[in-house]
Amino acid sequence: LQNTLSLASTWTQSSDTNRSSYKGKVVDLSNRDEIKTVVREVNEFFDGNLHALINNAFATPHTWKDGKGMEDDLSSDEIMDQWDLKIAVGLTAPFLLSRLCVPMLKRKDEKSSAGCIINISSTRAKQAEDNHEAYSAAKGGILGLTQASAISLGHRHNIRVNAIIPGWINVENENKEADEASTKWEDGMTEQDHSWHPAGRVGKVEDIYKAVKFLVESDFITGEEVVVDGGVTRKMYYPE
């Protein structure tokens, strides 16, 4: 988070950007009061006009801590506490943010256009891995939220709502240490990792950026799920 804030600060200080266009803020998305506070700040910063809300956060790790399963430690609240946090950040926060941002996203007059909401889901909403119950539930819930809010907010305010479903996107090198070491995004990937994808490579962050940009600019698309996974979910698998 601090690295992201530092990068945002660098962008605002460069000669080719508008200083008022960027702002970074650390927010605890499990805390509803913090969410409400930051939305008020965003409203003031952008003068009540928001083009796009992108819901992307999740409480890592995606699995239960210490390699545990959902059926372990039944006498303890540890698993349930993790569940509550992951669902709060991964599903409740996007719903609350969407609600609170409607006044900024909706059309202000006949000459203006409404903004849009883009929810980042995951192929894990449809394909499971061991011990991903909370992650899969949150990402599956995001798809339901997208469909329902696209209809509600579309009819009432012309706000478009879509979801992006990423597959394997390599983010291991998207951090401060990798930036300082000039690490390439694909470092650590094997040829087998890449060839497993019909598209010929593992996904990178820019692939999601391009999908987001496409949906922001496409004003006749709403309620849709855009899969960005290099074709993996279309493959048939057989036991070896």
Identify the role of each PLM range.
Residues 201-228, 233, 239:
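C-terminal substrate-recognition "lid" of short-chain dehydrogenase/reductases
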Residues 98, 138, 146:
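Active-site helix of classical SDR
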Residues 128-136, 148:
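Active-site loop-to-helix junction immediately N-terminal to the catalytic Tyr of the SDR YXXXK motif
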